Amino acid sequence: MGFLEKHSNERGADMRIGLPKEIKNHEQRVGLTPDSVSELTRRGHSVLVETNAGVGIGASDAAYVAVGAEIADDAPSVFDASEMIVKVKEPLAEERAMLREDHTLFTYLHLAPDAAQTADLVKSGATCIAYETVTDDDGGLPLLAPMSKVAGRMSIQAAANFLQQPNGGSGKLIGGVPGVAPAKIVIIGGGVVGQHAAEMAIGLGGNVTILDRNNDVLDHCESRWGAGVTTIYSTASALEEQVAAADVVIGAVLVKGDTAPKLVTVDMVNSMQAGSVLVDVAIDQGGAFETSHATTHTDPVYMVDDVVHYAVANMPGAVPRTSTYALNNATLPFTLALADMGPRAALLANPHLRNGLNVVGGKVVEPSVADALGYELADMDATIAAIAA
């Protein structure tokens, strides 16, 4: 089926789709661009957009109206009138209170480390599909990848900023200058985040080391950058040695849908030189450092034993134009399928979209979330069959 070809419509009716304004701290992304809304309205679906939802990407209310959307004064109006809610970040408590059993929620969720959110979604009865666990034919995570690329690149920008002495850092320039050594950048995890962090760091002239436990990943990184990167198989002793010597450590580990492993211990942080910088890109899934806790764009860093910690949970929200369009490029085919076919038929037809289903009908169907939070794992097929067409 072509990328924008209309799917068969089991529902026999077109869908009412809601686009609320994001309310997380300094979150300027939006779930649907005007171009994406245009694709939906051309198919006969109705889209209700909260006023100023797109202002962060330069999309005015008028731009949405021009492609067939209607504008609502507030979020309750959007939730009340919609069947499917399309967002970027996980719903905050005031948004979760507006979810109903007949809602489909399509957004990032990151439930494994978030017991409160999971409990509220279970209580709502809504069909909750997480971008970050949707898969593809290659075993990848296509809706997580765009933001992982952005976050990986931003991690080095953040590190360069907070290495500066006025910002609490040691006063080193990532690339050094002739006659002065560059900063040592240690990247834990060689996946999408890690590779894009490495690309930025190498481009700035940093001394880059990648640790991973997948030899194929290490081979790929070495083939890609050659002498520009050092690759090391990640063991506890190797990690201790590299972290102690690092000026910057990037936490780029990922376990699909699960909490991130705490690979950097308190003792490792204590071993680092004053003014070193930790950037925890895994903070959405609980963080890769024992000393991590989530921060915001308003107050992005804190110090532990004179080591700068940057752990902003929505890093790509600071570059909303780039990240919103990159995200929509990936999510639009799935959004169209859900709207055209209805959630039940779309989930039954597409195993990759089905892997994104985390909570439905008051039950948890994502194994990593059930394991992390102690929920009984419900049968996926039975819960999907119970969704209204």
Task: Please describe what each predicted stretch is.
Residues 223-305:
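Rossmann-like adenosine-cofactor binding region
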